[in-house]
Amino acid sequence: MASLSGSWRDAYKGMSSDNIKGLVLALSSSLFIGASFIVKKKGLKRAGASGLRAGSGGYSYLLEPLWWVGMITMIVGEIANFAAYAFAPAILVTPLGALSIIISAALAHVILHEKLHTFGLLGCVLCVVGSITIVLHAPQEQEIDSVLQVWNLATEPAFLLYAAAVVGAAIILIVQFVPQYGQSHVMVYIGVCSLVGSLSVMSVKALGIALKLTFSGMNQLIYPQTWVFTLIVLTCVITQMNYLNKALDTFNTAVVSPIYYVMFTSLTILASVIMFKDWDRQDGTQIVTELCGFVTILSGTFLLHKTKDMVDGSSSLGNLALRLPKQLEDSNGFEQEGIPLTLRRHECTKSPRPMRQFILPQDGPEAV
């Protein structure tokens, strides 16, 4: 028993001061980013009512003040997130983004009038429990004293292979799939955001380390590698924002937020493990515990997504009756599952047997 207790003490040595700073910054980031999703969604709706929608290639949202409020809120959150990566490993910082989904769900309940089911509340609890598990078992930040050291990690064969695969997949999605399937399949836009996002996080961490070292008296701005990382960050962030705007404007927030989180976080953790070798400094128990925490967060986001528009105490037919009118009103013609209603109607007209679409209000079905 004593040896077992000693092994646990060796495995868990507490959080370092840098990890604590990164944790506080990551929590602040989740607060701002979660709020920005709702504010930007409202701005995109307003802009779409008076001009070409972002999902159709329009940029009228750039003239909408509310969208800019959401954008500034997101920028503040991203700055806090940027700083968090300079102090803590990506395995600690990135999964905490699930808290932004909780904040987004709470604000959607208040502002967008999207009811939160009891199982949605359970999903929030699971996200918090999973986040705490990861925080308690996250690896300590690697000691890095120069941006050249980060550059050496980024140019190792394993990470170069990963980066090439990500860039290739993103280009294929943009060129081949976005024009044909972007408006009907949510995974296309989010796939581009997530793939590019994993590279942006690695570059953000490298740039954050360079700035942290510069502010501490070791100037890293004299190295060209610092500016290469800066260029990569700008390119990736612009690409992310463009396709994230398209996803938010085309599909329901309840669909975009959890799927984007799952894909982005999974790819970022994979990139961090390859580049910074975070798991090389941990034993099997800690790694498995972190993975369990991550799976717990995924379970929470799944519950939040699946029960977003369910009403407590309603039967399945009752839920359908309450959900269909809401989707038609809140999603601007798009179904909750991410498929545009116009496409579904078009498919119905192609059917050899005529089909009638029913809208089910609470007092009974009515054919339209």
Swiss-Prot record:
Record flagged with keyword NADP: no
Cytoplasmic side: 40-66, 112-115, 179-189, 242-255, 305-368
Topology term for the membrane: Multi-pass membrane protein
InterPro entries xref list: Mg_trans_NIPA
Extracellular compartment segments: 1-18, 88-90, 137-157, 211-220, 277-283
Keywords associated with the record: Cell membrane, Endosome, Ion transport, Magnesium, Membrane, Transmembrane, Transmembrane helix, Transport
Localization in the cell: Cell membrane; Early endosome
Coiled-coil region: none
Listed transmembrane segments: 19-39, 67-87, 91-111, 116-136, 158-178, 190-210, 221-241, 256-276, 284-304
KW Transport (keyword) present: yes
A GO MF label: magnesium ion transmembrane transporter activity
Primary localization: membrane
A Pfam family of this chain: Mg_trans_NIPA
One GO CC annotation: plasma membrane
Gene Ontology biological process terms from the UniProt entry: magnesium ion transport
Oligomeric form and interacting partners: Homodimer.
Job description of the protein: Acts as a Mg(2+) transporter. Can also transport other divalent cations such as Fe(2+), Sr(2+), Ba(2+), Mn(2+) and Co(2+) but to a much less extent than Mg(2+).
Family per similarity comment: Belongs to the NIPA (TC 2.A.7) family.
Name of the protein in its database record: Probable magnesium transporter NIPA3
Species: Arabidopsis thaliana (Mouse-ear cress)
